[in-house]
């Protein structure tokens, strides 16, 4: 069946209020009218400047599609990129790329770091089924990441360009898990084991070149994953990052 190669340019949001060392849970902003609310922190002034910097970095990239988390820190970062890029008129809302819901740990930097440290020690991430109270497990997040990959392969295949480029504006932990999932696929496909993902700064960029094939059942299957750029914040050289 027909193959399609496409590029994902994945961008973390600019600095948000919950990234500040002074942030407290009492300052938290949540999404409304949801059974499981998500933290919905706005960009700081620095975060807005960072968004403008990554927008300038990507201003000459020809995008054929853009998707973004609806959480305002990622959505507003995406809007800055749209404003600076003549090839991209808008981005589509995609809740699959929302940040992992940290539940009671959201805004608690020490607890989040401890949780991350424990989870990184487990090689088989499908074992990480424990949910943070009022939040998501790693496995819950991986379900969303895989659903996104299925969806974006279908969308890429439908774009009438040979090698389309797609913008994804999202979040730190989501990007971390996407890397894990793609690294596992790359290992299964080609026996190539990837190292640990470096820390991604605010507005840091990952770029992947993916090759997909549509099977006889109509389902898309990844055949190759190329890790082009990982955790790059070169556009932030003169700006403090979190």
Regions found by a protein language model. Name each.
Residues 1-64, 79, 83, 87, ...:
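An N-terminal RHG(E/S)-centered segment typical of histidine phosphatases
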Residues 1-7, 100-112, 158-162, 179-242:
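Acidic, low-complexity terminal tails and accessory targeting/binding regions
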Residues 7-11, 161-173:
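Beta-strand elements within well-structured catalytic alpha/beta cores of enzymes
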Residues 36-39, 120-140:
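Short glycine/proline- and acidic residue-enriched helix-loop micro-motifs
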Residues 49-122, 195-206:
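Phosphate-coordination/substrate-recognition cap region in phosphate-metabolizing enzymes
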Residues 60-62, 152-164:
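Glycine-rich phosphate-binding loop signature in dinucleotide/nucleotide-binding domains
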Residues 68-69, 143, 169-170:
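Short beta-strand scaffold positions
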